[in-house]
Design a protein with these regions (language model features):
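NAD(P)-cofactor binding segment of oxidoreductase domains
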Residues: 217-233, 303-310, 370-397
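Flexible, Lys/Arg-rich cytosolic regulatory linkers and terminal tails that connect or flank
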Residues: 220-278, 391
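Strand-loop microenvironment adjacent to phosphate/nucleotide-handling motifs in alpha/beta enzyme folds
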Residues: 6, 264, 269-273, 426-442, ...
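Signature of alpha-helical transmembrane segments in polytopic membrane proteins
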Residues: 1-134, 163, 232
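Conserved Rossmann-fold NAD(P)-dependent oxidoreductase catalytic core, especially the SDR/UDP-sugar
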Residues: 242, 358, 362-365, 369-421, ...
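Conserved Rossmann-fold cofactor-binding substructure of NAD(P)-dependent oxidoreductases
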Residues: 335-355
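A solvent-exposed beta-alpha-beta segment
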Residues: 19, 23, 30-32, 125-232, ...
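N-terminal Rossmann NAD(P)H-binding glycine-rich loop of SDR-like oxidoreductase domains
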Residues: 279-299
Length: 606
């Protein structure tokens, strides 16, 4: 219905209600009286009619969408009616010196009941009849706090929503059996599976954006038992900043099931390192590198250099940052290979960065077993080139992105990352630059990680391939890993290897099961197949070796590990002679070097 038609309809309806109310009010007190023989009542009716329409326009009673009527709309009706009656009483007093108090009181009551009833009846009709005729999914809302009730209200008010809330669950005992917008709190989160059956629930929305850690993991696991579709609210900060609305639900991701409390950052110390400075990120097009760029830009650097050898990935992160930050600071995309020493020196000399985040590396374990020379070239020589250039041109802080696979490494990739750590620790002894490394476990969602592989296998009907039923890994999210890198740079005094307390390791088998269930399938439908441990893989991973001292946390959940350094000549020998070595010989050399074995004498003897 157009606004003009709506206005005409409500104007005529209200006119009838006004005249009917004053007539009935007088008739109740003075039955069988001829209404037209009482001049004051005619004057009062005209006054009430005119004043009602004036105040109705003043309080926008003709503009409101009454299908979404609530307490605010009722208050507006009461104000408009009360003021209309007050004006009528004033006119009666002026004309006759008397006020028909009882008539006006009855008129006031009928007026509010009929005006309010006419407006709210449409909402009741829509909620209880029209919505039932739609094909809507019965929805359970987990959490009856501010977020949960906001979700319920928006679902009830959105006539096009596919979801209709039928129940809440909440662990606050005081809310038990309370109703919010007509939806009852029927129990706590431990009853989710039973509530789903009792109320024929087809959809679950988890509306607890502030809850963290093991508690949210427990709630997700309770929801998974029900085998219905599960969604969750966006993050509170995203809602507050206007990035998303409260009803833009997202799928539950495996990252949500980690149950990890995020690391709280020292924003002030990070800001001092970044704001107004020139920042260089190598590997800027990769999963970790691109996220470091996003996080860095939040702190308003003077200039950010996006360095990488893949033009497509650099182009994508460049465009993303330009669209987000416009002309707030300078963004410079640089296509370069960290293996090209001359090019890296040119870049450092030209731009003179204050902070370098070195994320460029080969990270795929099985691939590097087959390509050890490429691993050395990129992870060892590439790191040496960037770190040496940083030293030469006075970079204040250099942060190496390392891996938990550098601890007691059993593969080429982990060994080259450990040797890269040794290189920057050696430089830290004499350089004015603060060199640090950051170790963390597997990053969920990064390119080449297990999650994208599992998702692809599920999409094709399975089975999901797991190397071993008992294999475990430490996991963290890409944003968390990137923030840790930035925090390490802020904490750096030189030569440290920072390690994150990553909580409990996760079984890959459990990860696969959770992902299958979150995708809406049963384990039996998709299946899990064991493929065996691949070359270079460990059953279990560590964050610190036995010979590394685990000190007290230097920051909440961040520790410093001390490592044993190898003689510099052994690393120099590797860099000078790796191209001449056979693959098996090179594999043995880097593994021995990374595990603090005397490899130089053996290599020279051969």
């Amino acid at each position: 219905m157009s606004y003009q038609k709506r206005l005409s309809f409500l104007f005529l309806l209200d006119s009838f209600i006004v005249l009917f109310s004053i007539f009935v009010g007088y008739e109740v007190l003075h039955p069988y009286t001829n209404f037209y023989t009482v001049p004051l009542l005619i004057i009062s009716s005209i006054t009430l009619l005119i004043s009602h329409h004036i105040f109705a326009f003043s309080y926008s009673l003709y503009k409101k969408a009454w299908e979404y009527a609530s307490v605010n709309e009722l208050v507006a009706i009461v104000k408009a009616v009360t003021l209309s009656i007050s004006v009528t009483a004033l006119v009666q007093f002026i004309v006759e010196g008397n006020i028909y108090v009882r008539v006006l009181m009855l008129t006031w009551m009928f007026h509010i009941l009929l005006i309010g009833g006419s407006r709210f009846s449409w909402r009741m009709f829509r909620d209880h009849y029209i919505r039932k005729t739609l094909n809507q999914k019965r929805t359970l809302i987990v959490g009856a706090g501010a977020a949960g009730t906001m979700v319920a209200r928006q679902l009830l008010n959105n006539k096009e929503s596919e979801l209709i809330p039928v129940a809440f669950v909440d662990d606050d005992f005081k809310k038990r059996n309370l109703q919010f917008f007509g939806v009852t709190v029927v129990g706590n989160t431990k009853r989710i599976e039973k509530v789903v059956i009792e109320h024929q629930v087809e959809h679950i929305i988890i509306a607890m954006p502030s809850i963290k850690g093991k508690e949210i993991k427990r709630i997700y696991e309770e929801c998974l038992k029900s085998k219905v579709k599960i969604q969750t609210m966006p993050m509170v900060e995203d809602i507050m900043t206007g990035k998303v609305s409260v009803n833009q639900f997202r799928e539950v991701e495996v990252e949500d099931l980690l149950g990890r409390d995020p690391v709280q950052l020292d924003m002030e110390s990070i800001s001092k390192k970044i704001k107004g400075n020139t920042i260089l990120v190598t590997g800027a097009g990769g999963s970790i590198g691109s996220e470091i760029c996003r996080q860095v830009c939040k702190f308003q650097p003077k200039k950010i250099l996006l360095l990488g050898h893949g033009e497509n990935s650099i182009y994508q992160i460049d465009m993303e940052l330009r669209n987000t930050y416009k002309d707030e600071f300078e963004i410079i995309p640089i296509i370069a290979d960290v293996q090209d020493q001359k090019r890296i020196l040119e870049i450092m000399e030209l731009h003179r960065p204050d902070v370098v985040y070195h994320a460029a590396a080969h990270k795929h374990v099985p691939l590097m077993e087959y390509n050890p020379k490429e691993a050395v070239k990129n992870n060892v020589i590439g790191t040496k080139n960037v770190a040496t250039a940083a030293d030469v041109f006075g970079v204040r802080t250099f942060v190496l992105v390392s891996s938990d696979k550098a601890v007691n490494p059993t593969n080429v990739m982990g060994s080259t990352k450990r040797i890269a750590e040794m290189i920057i620790q050696e430089l830290a002894k004499t350089s004015q630059t603060k060199f640090v490394a950051v170790r963390f476990g597997n990053v969920l969602g990064s390119r080449g990680s297990v999650i994208p592989l599992f998702k692809k296998q599920i999409q094709t009907g399975g089975p999901v391939t797991v190397t071993h039923p008992d294999m475990t890994r430490y996991f963290m999210t890409i944003p968390e890993a990137s923030r840790l890198v930035m925090q390490a740079g802020a904490l750096a005094s030189g030569g440290e290897i920072f390690v994150l307390d990553m909580g409990e390791p996760v079984k890959i088998m459990d990860l696969a099961k959770n992902l299958i269930q979150l995708s809406g399938y049963t384990i039996e439908e998709i299946g899990i197949q064991f493929s065996g441990i691949r070359p270079g893989e460990k059953m279990y991973e560590e964050l610190l070796g036995e010979n590394e001292v685990h000190k007290d946390a230097v920051f909440p959940k961040i520790f410093i590990g001390k490592t044993t350094l190898q003689p510099r000549e052994e690393i120099d020998y590797l860099i000078d002679h790796y191209l001449d070595m056979k693959e098996e010989e090179l594999q043995g050399f880097v593994l021995g070097l990374a595990n603090n074995k005397k490899v130089l004498e053996r290599a020279v003897a051969n």
